[in-house]
């Protein structure tokens, strides 16, 4: 069976017959590209104006065109105008709507000097630039939640871990700020990406540019871009801006997943570091006692989805010769999904973090355990002039002695330390405390309370510019 007509498409005159129903179904994209309708209409207004400036529309025709486009925009917004079954894509649907309102003679003039190839490349960038700012706001809300918890628990110690084993005491605020720094870089990446996304492919035509005297920079300016592309082939064929957005989205997903993994662990009975707020946890259909960290688990799961969006898009792009290929119809759903996923996920994650109830007593109790002060012993010896290689050995011997007795380092007697080495004098006890360990790490980047306060000031200085971007 074949379609009775090729109406709703922007091509067909050179063909003897209509496309097969199977091809028409495969080609149809209005079910996902309709969300670009308002960008398409904005582009049509800008295009009409450059047609008029080039002498291809009269002033009267321009007024009629803009009136028809405004009416179509209102009908799209209200839902009075939607894509028809015969429409191949958003571009064809909106041209149909324009012709219905302006008539075929005037409405048919708008397509001069533009192609779906440059339209979709430009409108995709416009969509992503808007949604980059929405995503940035969500990430900033998550950062703010981390900062608020860091402020509220500035002096609280906790076990710092490597390999998930006790390593050295750190401040909870220092740990939370580590996650905040990662997310700050994500927003900075979006801000940096936006400079590359702010170049308009509109005016590139199918691939070779326009011969009608149209000004692509005028369209770029009206649509909020910084400039037009310098290479029309690159403008229509490249999707690195899409892929880069998807990579940043995946990185945000990974960073949220790492936070979430810790919260899942911290909320277990074995850790008991945090209690989840009822508003951000769920129960079990069979076990009445359960309080499940579903937000954190879904964040962890959706990170895989975001990585999948990126890898799928890159796989689509990897084999495409210049310039445009129909494979690029597949460029939109991955980035649409990435934006949608983060815009859904981020409010839940920021809310979960903001409402965490930290069991600070348990965190501080566990902070020095597991011989977490062993490095402080070695560092103390270094300050006494002992080479670090020897200091490391002596500290390890003290750990072995304490472990054999089932006690911590501070439980060893002065005599036991002296038996290990005369260099382990009673003055060693000045560092055998959580407070002493923390205070000693006062260099930039350290976990001492003073260093964390300095870190916070540096963080705020970098945060201000990205807040401006997200507005």
From Swiss-Prot:
Subcellular locations according to the entry: Cytoplasm
Cytoplasm as UniProt keyword: yes
Functional pathway: Amino-acid biosynthesis; L-arginine biosynthesis; L-arginine from L-ornithine and carbamoyl phosphate: step 3/3
Enzyme Commission number, as recorded: 4.3.2.1
Main subcellular location of this protein, as a coarse class: cytoplasm
Gene Ontology BP, a term: arginine biosynthetic process via ornithine
GO cellular component: cytosol
GO molecular function terms noted in the UniProt entry: argininosuccinate lyase activity
Top-rank EC class of the record's enzyme: lyase
Catalyzed reactions per annotation: 2-(N(omega)-L-arginino)succinate = fumarate + L-arginine
Alphabetic keyword roster: Amino-acid biosynthesis, Arginine biosynthesis, Cytoplasm, Lyase
NCBIfam families attached to this UniProt entry: argH
Sequence similarity: Belongs to the lyase 1 family. Argininosuccinate lyase subfamily.
Protein name: Argininosuccinate lyase
Organism for this UniProt entry: Renibacterium salmoninarum (strain ATCC 33209 / DSM 20767 / JCM 11484 / NBRC 15589 / NCIMB 2235)
